[in-house]
């Protein structure tokens, strides 16, 4: 909802899953760390929505970045995505349904600690 109003590209959970099967995608979870530990999109990295800098993102500005938060009413993912676009990233998306939409679509999830996170 907010992502479209901000002029950002929006991606559905199903489309994200398809994209992840075809090419490398940086999936960025801007929910709380506790939420990330509880349930997340497979391979998603935790990211502080407004406290991140360029070193937290891929060096290649053509990388595909997909941000998500809790649900379609959450503003953290659109704000973080806008920030990435302002840094010069060209392929930036918001999964506006958030993790609740991903889970609601019965897509696979991960939980718990992950090496390197």
Language model features: what each stretch is:
Residues 58-103:
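Catalytic cysteine-centered active loop of the rhodanese-like fold, especially the PTP/DSP P-loop
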Residues 44-51, 90-94, 113:
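Short hydrophobic/aromatic-enriched beta-strand-loop microsegments
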Residues 40-44, 80-83, 107-110:
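Short, glycine/charged-enriched secondary-structure capping and boundary segments
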Residues 1-35, 110-117:
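Flexible, polar/low-complexity N-terminal or interdomain linker segments that lie immediately upstream
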Residues 36-42, 56-59, 102:
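Short loop/helix-cap segments at secondary-structure boundaries that form the rim of catalytic
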Residues 18, 25, 49-71, 109-114:
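Mobile, glycine- and charge-enriched loop segments
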Residues 21-27, 42-43, 90-91:
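Short active-site oxyanion
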Residues 29-49:
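N-terminal-biased segments
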């Amino acid at each position: 909802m907010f992502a479209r109003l901000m002029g950002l590209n929006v991606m559905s959970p199903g489309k994200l899953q398809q994209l992840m099967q075809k090419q490398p995608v940086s999936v960025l979870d801007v929910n709380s760390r506790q939420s990330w530990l509880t349930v997340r999109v497979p391979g998603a990295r935790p990211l502080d929505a407004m406290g991140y800098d360029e070193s937290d993102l891929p060096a290649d500005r053509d990388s595909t970045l997909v941000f998500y938060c809790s649900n379609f009413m959450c503003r953290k993912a659109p704000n973080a995505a806008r920030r990435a676009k302002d840094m010069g990233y060209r392929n930036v998306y918001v999964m506006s349904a958030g993790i609740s939409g991903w889970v609601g679509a019965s897509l696979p999830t991960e939980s718990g600690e992950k090496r390197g996170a």
